[in-house]
A protein has these predicted regions:
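Catalytic cores of carbohydrate-active enzymes across secretory and cytosolic contexts
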Residues: 1-503
Length: 503
């Protein structure tokens, strides 16, 4: 579990931003929202260049502005029902409006504490991590329930799948799955039965462990809903979807409701000018009047960053020289493929005048890149992206997206109206690591990607009015649907109505 609070180093990708966006929006509109998550004292990994473009790991520290907002509220000794010692933790509270985050820092045993020092460094002993996370979070929930009524507990991702088994039956639990990818469905932690004194269902994955006991299972886009029904057909009757959203106050930089396209165009020019200043200072490169095209997200195989590599490598000199490409993203620290891909981008960044790679991707760089580029590229392999929110952050600022046919793009983009699509939409989930057909799909998708990108650059250069119209359409059409208030109303509709009645 991660939550990318402002100033924190607990950021790895879209899930952390999503959870923090929920938190901030809920706190702002008066929803008594409680988020329980680990406090990782060493944050997440950060990356930088070294000699010969080597991608090296560096420390990513929490900002003092974030740490100063944490209040120590006590400690807990966590034991299983049998009395078996699980962990000692310190608890910290982070308050924003009506929302509250309770962050736990594991102190001992040392072997368990090490699993919670860095975000996503628990892979050497995943089962111990799952057991501790469930035992700690369930104890916190029970203590909260002793003083206030809990409307529902939403379990985010499979690593917390054991939590509902430790809660009283009168506490309603729901499960939200955030990825179709295999890493999101780890094998069952059968040792938990002995350690925690619980009985688990006869299933293979932690995802199924959660799906068995929770009364509802949410996916995070319509496409993800369709894919998940096929991956987990046993639980079709429990499945629903609520498409992800963003905190508009955190991500929308174009202020107010711009009614005319001329005012919109001026606002876009100001944002781009600001981003150009940042890029030129960071890179030392001249951008001039080139179209800025960005690819910004985790560097992982299914998101297909190699489409950018192919664009830079192949005989696309005419197209390449007409644009300035910005790439930013972090690979998982255990992902050797991702690290090598990042090193490839580093080499290109050193060699090419119109390409820049920023390795230390986080909230701050995303704030400028996603909102100030001319075009965003969204390239996941079809059926692999649960939702995606980068195109939402871009769209509400009038940045259109060239997207593969996956995730929430299918609900937001109308081709040639407020953005563009490329490639094919697959109906079945394909294991891209094991199925040879994936490379053939990649080849076809890339050819269409290149064709559509060339068309878009042509429009930008020769018919600027049409390009601005499409960008303006993105701004107008995205904003109502991607507002986090819509998501909160869908997840907690009954509660929010009750809250209104009491106010």
């Amino acid at each position: 579990m991660e939550a990318a609070f402002n100033g924190s180093a607990n950021y790895a990708g879209g899930l952390g931003v999503l959870e923090a966006d929920k938190f901030y929006t809920a706190g702002r509109i008066g929803v008594p929202y409680i988020l329980i998550a680990p406090f990782y004292p060493n944050g997440y990994v950060d990356w930088d260049y070294a000699n010969k473009a080597k991608h090296v790991e560096v420390r990513h520290r929490h900002g003092f502005s974030f740490l100063s907002k944490l209040s120590y509220i006590g400690g807990l000794e966590i034991k299983a029902g049998s009395g078996r010692f699980i962990a000692d933790v310190d608890l910290y509270e982070y308050v924003y409006g009506s929302a509250k985050a309770i962050l736990y820092r594991v102190k001992r045993p040392l072997t368990t504490a090490k699993l919670f020092r860095y975000l996503y460094r628990h892979h050497r002993d995943e089962c111990t991590y799952y057991i501790a996370a469930a035992a700690i979070s369930s104890e916190i929930i029970k203590r909260i329930a002793s003083s206030i009524e809990i409307y529902t507990v939403d379990i985010q991702e499979a690593h917390l799948a054991l939590t509902p088994y430790l809660l009283p039956k009168n506490i309603k639990t729901r499960f939200v799955t955030h990825t179709p990818g295999p890493w999101g469905h780890p094998k069952i932690c059968i040792e938990a039965e002995e350690v925690l004194g619980i009985s688990l269902p006869n299933v293979k994955t932690m995802t199924e462990v959660a799906m068995e006991i929770c009364e509802k299972v949410f996916t995070v886009s319509r496409k993800h809903f369709v894919t998940t029904k096929k991956l987990f057909p046993k639980y079709v009757n429990k499945l629903e979807y609520v498409t992800n959203a963003i905190d508009l106050e955190r991500w929308r930089r174009i202020e107010g409701d711009i009614k005319d396209i001329d005012s919109f165009s001026k606002a876009r020019q100001n944002l781009k000018k600001e981003f150009i200043s940042i890029l030129q200072v960071l890179s030392g490169k001249r951008i001039e009047d080139k179209m800025i095209i960005s690819w910004c997200r985790r560097i992982v195989r299914y998101k297909r960053p190699y489409f950018i590599e192919w664009l830079l490598e192949e005989n696309n000199i005419d197209l390449r020289d007409r644009i300035f490409i910005v790439v930013s993203g972090k690979p998982h620290p255990s992902d050797e493929w991702g690290r090598k891909q990042a090193e490839t981008f580093t080499k290109f960044s050193k060699a090419l005048p119109n390409f820049y790679f920023y390795p230390s991707y986080g909230i701050e760089f995303a704030y400028y890149a996603l909102t100030s580029s001319d075009l965003l590229l969204f390239t996941p392999f079809s059926c692999w992206e649960a939702s995606g929110t980068s195109m939402m952050k871009a769209g509400v600022n009038g940045v259109p997206t060239l997207s593969s046919r996956d995730g929430a793009s299918l609900e937001l983009i109308e081709d040639n109206v407020n953005g563009w699509f490329f490639g094919v939409e697959l109906e079945e989930f394909i294991d891209i690591e094991k199925n040879d057909i994936a490379s053939k799909i990649d080849e076809k998708d890339y050819n269409d990607f290149l064709k559509r990108l060339t068309e878009i650059v042509d429009i930008y250069e020769s018919d600027k009015e049409k390009f601005i119209e499409i960008a303006y359409n993105a701004y107008k059409s995205f904003t109502p649907y991607v507002d986090m208030k819509r998501l909160l109303k869908q997840y907690y509709s009954n509660f929010i109505e009750e809250l209104k009645d009491k106010q």
